[in-house]
A protein has these predicted regions:
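Phosphate-binding loop/pocket of nucleotide- and phosphate-handling active sites
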Residues: 23-26, 85-116
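Active-site/ligand-binding loops adjacent to catalytic centers
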Residues: 2-80
Length: 116
């Protein structure tokens, strides 16, 4: 699964358009700074792995990142940084669409801690 903010989603765009490589995402804008990668060097390999694994790529609405980050913090108890709002949004969407099935084990990567 690839999850990106709709403010910077070059991998999702390439995946949805069945492209073999990513294009530079001009005017990238996201509060999830760790995911602000408008020109991923490994775009080709990411897309190849997604294709070979029957993966999926989804975007999270930039306007929902803060609330999704807070929802994750309350539910899981980890004071994660805003990037988790993208991850949590994708998890909720894929669970709702039954792409993630009930009882399936899922690992959500929270790679940053909020500094206060």
């Amino acid at each position: 699964v690839v999850a990106q903010s709709d403010g910077c989603a070059p991998v999702v765009e390439a995946f949805q358009n069945h492209q073999d490589s990513t294009s530079f995402w001009h005017k990238s804008n996201t509060i999830a700074l760790g995911l602000n990668v408008p020109g991923p060097l490994g775009g080709y390999w990411i897309l190849k792995i997604l294709s070979e694994s029957n993966g999926i790529a989804v975007t999270a609405q930039e306007t929902s990142l803060e609330i999704n980050t807070e929802n994750f913090r309350k539910r899981i108890g980890i004071d994660a940084s805003t990037e988790i709002g993208v991850v949590w949004s994708a998890y909720e969407e894929l669970t709702e669409k039954k792409w993630i099935t009930p009882g399936e084990k899922v690992v959500l990567f929270a790679t940053g801690i909020e500094r206060r």
